Amino acid sequence: MKFKVIIIILMFVAGPALAAENDALKINAFGTLGLVHSDNDKADFVTTVVQSRGAGYTRDWSGVVDSRLGVQLTYLPTDKLSAVLQVIAEQRDDGVIRPEVEWAYLQYAITPSLSVRIGRTVLPTYLHSQYRKVSYANHWVRPPAEFYVVPVNNSDGISILFNRHFGELNYALHGVFGQGDQDQAGDLRTEAKNTLAVANTFEYGAATLRFAYSQTQLTSKEINELFDVYRLFGSQGSAIADRYNLDDKRLRIFTVGGSYDPGAWFVMSEWSKTKIESFFGNSIAWYVSGGYRLGSVTPYLTYAQTRSAGDGSKQQLDAGSAPPFLAGLANNLNGVLAAMTRPVDQKTITMGVRWDFASNAAFKVQYDHINLDDNSSGVLTNVQPDFKLGDSVNLLSLVVDFTF
């Protein structure tokens, strides 16, 4: 792994030198400078499972939730072969902003309609997966948190891209097979293997329709070590560990999405169902968003919702039947399990305005009202003991997005 990182760094450093000698090398950059404020200081609002610091508990105003800087190198030595390297610096699992590789692949065009990629790519799980971190390309400050919070976003392996025109209808197939891993907040590391993703996209004029399916097998050593403690309580504890641990558990995500953008206005929506036999639990999420372009100013609205889709039953250790010296531990473990399997049900209403004040820069202001369902802490993190379940959270975000 260290050798791979060294090679990537050498490629990154050598890029400018190659650019002086070869016009086939293109360098692009993008970024976001953002601030977000939360009125609830008992939990943090974050945008990914990677982030350990957010707005609310850590700081009422946070500059690390949305801020990032990315650089992409594209090398085209021939009309069939290309290489892409994208590095993004943003907040990582330890709360520090540092660069990591988002894309790193070679692509070969077998035919004008069929290409193969080998290397690291972003999974095509959702409508905006491929460019969700290029905030300038999106009308909102960030994608709905209810929808885009997933354990693994990248895959190291092989991708197949196919497109075909049928008159005015364009069809695109994007398939991925590989593996990967992800460091997450709380000193957790999730390993994904046998990752498979298939996305089908249909475009007709201003309309886009997309169907996608992805699955992977997830393992987390840290999570499994925690649930191994439950096995001290015999068959009851082993049943809990087997149900909720993360030991080669299959995660499946089904998504349907679409958009319509005739120019002056736009609307988009997505629906997804996530299934996994683990503490994550099953869930259903959806959103609808739209806006109207008034010259350089674009006001927009978004409504998003996520809810648990399991059977609602939860197992607990019977502390009363445990030996006296283990009764206290059983109660503590029940508390941990209750927190880990707590519903994430929430609804968010978003209002915002985008102002394109330059050809390559935009200012956005956005207000989010998050309404948590009863007994839910939503997708918030760093939830404190005195956090009120079912409470609401109000966010105010100010960002500047740019590309060059």
What are these regions (language model features)?
Residues 14-16:
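N-terminal signal peptide c-region/cleavage motif recognized by signal peptidases
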Residues 38-42, 94-97, 125-130, 171, ...:
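Outer-membrane beta-barrel proteins
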Residues 21-38, 58-182, 192-196, 200-211, ...:
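Outer membrane beta-barrel
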Residues 40-42, 58, 107, 228-404:
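Outer-membrane beta-barrel pore domains
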Residues 2-8:
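Sec-dependent signal peptide recognition
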Residues 110-113, 151-295:
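Signature for the C-terminal beta-barrel architecture of outer-membrane proteins
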Residues 10-12:
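Short, linear, compositionally biased motifs with a strong N-terminal bias
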Residues 47-55, 385:
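A solvent-exposed, charged loop/short amphipathic helix patch at secondary-structure junctions
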